[in-house]
């Protein structure tokens, strides 16, 4: 039976997931319902939530909650769902910490501007107007790959 450290960890995971779900709803609404005049405000809202998401998901408190739950669950089989969750959370924490908050914010803003530019370029059948945004996105994705590391 999971104890209080695991339950506390789950509450943190739920909070992080709730922010991610709110981002998804805001993104969907932006793409489907929102008038163009609200775009800059929506981008700011989404960037703020991405910042909070990154802060929570990379915090020392979250890392400590993971380790406290892991200690509490020590001895469980590796294929137990709780053990698997601990492994995934540890992996995600290490991975998320490789991206600075400034990088996450930049990626969020650039991605949002690129989406708007893509939408306008598609309507105007003008790839050239979207190309600089795409180039910047590719540059950021390459930087992310460098931060994460990879094997050739």
Q: At which residue positions do the language-model features occur?
A:
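A well-structured
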Residues: 1-152
